[in-house]
UniProtKB/Swiss-Prot annotation:
One of its GO terms (cellular component) is plasma membrane. One of its GO terms (molecular function) is ATP binding. Belongs to the ATPase alpha/beta chains family. Disulfide bonds: none annotated. It is an enzyme of class 7 (translocase). NCBIfam families: atpD. This is ATP synthase subunit beta. The keyword Membrane applies.
Amino acid sequence: MATGKILQITGVVIDAEFPADSLPQIYNALEIPLGQGRPSLICEVQQQLGDSVVRAVAMSTTDGLVRGMDVINTGAPISVPVGPETLGRVFDVQGRPIDGEGPVGTTKTMPIHRPAPTFEEQSNRAELFETGIKVIDLIAPFTKGGKTGVFGGAGVGKTVIIQELISNIAKEQSGYSVFAGVGERSREGNDLIHEMKDSKIPGTDQTVFDKTVMVFGQMNEPPGARLRVALSALTMAEYFREEGRDVLLFVDNIFRFTQAGSEVSALLGRMPSQVGYQPTLGTEMGELQERITSTKTGSITSLQAVYVPADDYTDPAPATTFAHLDATISLERSISEKGIYPAVDPLASTSRILDPNIVGEEHYRVATEVQRMLQRYKDLQDIIAILGVEELSDDDKLTVSRARKLERFFSQPFGVAEVFTNIPGKYVAVGDTVKSFARVLAGEFDHIPESFFFMKGRIDDVVAAFDASKQ
């Protein structure tokens, strides 16, 4: 391993000189021993500047570094531990445990920079992945081994949906999950860990946390860590896929990955592109997203929260993410303002597999009929605001009544939100969801007031609440 010297330190960017015959390659990890019992500082080579000088980005704070310090070329990219021993543990971008539970009991490691699966290795089967959340399963069903984006501005419920899905999948499908906390609040990460440790898997003595790997590079971390933490988590998920498992990868928040790339790009002196983003935005996003896919051995199903700056969907960061997704779940502030959670907009959410050949004729018919009715209700809202409901035709009055019931029936109590709502969480199977909405559309419950549809699971819960109110 060649040793060089630090020439210059600019924030988290370090220039180091190496012997001409042992210049580190792009993406190689450099190690700077700090001494005094402190862990070494790891940097990643981003540029070769000429004259045997490389420019690298630090993965943690550069406090205490001085010019002239030794820099060791490790000869390989950053590597992270992989395997079942990583389950129930919390890591940083370098794969070091940060949960205070001691070292990880595995010697297997994999580099975070790896090629995407080839066309021959990829699987092209289209299959619905059940989430237990009514509005998602009906309108924007997940693809097994596909990528879904949860779009929304600040505070509309992206993280809560992700938390509920992790909980549902561990409890109902006993699957493994990998969670990447990219540039989000440390408090939310801490809350999520405790929530998962308290959440038992029915019929076992295991918790949801025992089936999850967590990798964090939060808001307070340097941009290098936030840029690479998604790759570290993805590498751990890829190992499970190659072992023949179906694994879930949660990224909260993919926008922060783009934001960190923008910061690193500026620090490296690249000319910014539109709205100040890095010129390599499309390439960086593609390198990450193309690795999240199904192969013939296993699958990675990904859910990514996407922060939309100022609720502007034309911003380059969310717009670039759109191109890679199989399904989009749009969270709307106007729906959350009505107190309807999850605040999913059924008219703006889409899925590639909402197709009668994949989900079945009945599911497709019910989903499109629900959307048609909600769209008609939306069209009538201007007339209602000016003239009132009484001026509508009888058919339109019925449409409005059923649409309002559908809107409220899309709300659902979440297990992870029970501490706020005092309503036990409900998991609803896809078959029950389709049947329930079909019965509402058919007018079977026209006699039940819309308030009884709010925060219920199956339609039986609505009927039971209505019957109880009459006694």
